[in-house]
Amino acid sequence: MNDINPTPVDTPDDPRLEDYRDLTDIPGRRKLEGDEFFICEGPVAIERLFASGHHIRSALVLEEKAPRLQQLFAEYGTSAPLYTCDRNVMLAVTGFDLHRGVIAAADRKPIPKGTARHNVLAGLDKITVLEGLNDPENLGAIARSAHALGIQALVLDERCIDPYTRRSVRVSMGEVLHLPTMRFDSPDDLRNLLRDWTVWALTPHPLADNIWTLDVPKRLALMLGEEGPGLHEATMAVANQRVRIPLNDNVDSLNVGNAAAAAFAIVSRPSTS
């Protein structure tokens, strides 16, 4: 393992820190990052970033945080720049108090499109389909639960937020970086993509089947819709079955992140047969 020597930066207008500029400017960040790179923050998420195989562009850390990042750079053979600065410089660059003082930029992996999506899904047996999720924290929470509970890929419609937004990556604790992600553009496209899958649509409707009572199929795609409206009827029609999580009286529904975690745990439980 090679020793990595940090590069001190003492001014916020240093052009080498451009990837980290104004992180709270959402439109500006979309324009800057595009489909090229993303930001990961926090020690745990960054450890998961290194383990994910994404190419690291650079890291920016408070001076006292450098030793752990040096270990990660050496462990994974990373040759990207490791910049250090004080808290005032980091605040001026990023636009907010990054209290954990650890942030990195990494290149995105290409998103599979068209028939390439079938190749990605070929060896999998449990995936989730998300429609209309526009809250990065919900998506991040779902990705974290998915990877923890045996869900192997995310299939998103075009209205879902970018799963690589900084807040999604942070809330997922970096787990979203370990899940293949792809898009579908219409119910017909989704139906074609999932032609070899059993598809369940999760809904709070009382006439839907109790998910606890069902045998989990060999290949299952579990669909969830956005907070409030849920799945569109045309998307729901792709499903072979509509399922619900039974709730106590007077509770009509769960937050989509909580519902996803519960459903993932149910469908991934060991068989008792």
Where are these regions (language model features)?
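Active-site/ligand-binding-proximal alpha/beta "capping" segment
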Residues: 200-251, 255
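Short, aromatic/basic amphipathic alpha-helical patches
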Residues: 67-79, 234-235
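RNA substrate-binding interface of SAM-dependent RNA methyltransferases
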Residues: 4, 110-207
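Amphipathic alpha-helical repeat scaffolds
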Residues: 42, 134-142, 254-258
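Boundary-proximal intrinsically disordered activation/regulatory segments immediately upstream
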Residues: 1-70, 160-162
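Short acidic-hydrophobic, aromatic-tinged amphipathic segments that line or gate anion-handling sites
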Residues: 6-13, 81-86, 179-189
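Glycine/small-residue-rich loop that forms an oxyanion/phosphate-binding "nest" at active or ligand-binding sites
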Residues: 74-103
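Structured adenosyl-cofactor binding patch, chiefly the S-adenosyl-L-methionine
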Residues: 104, 145-149, 163-176, 233-273
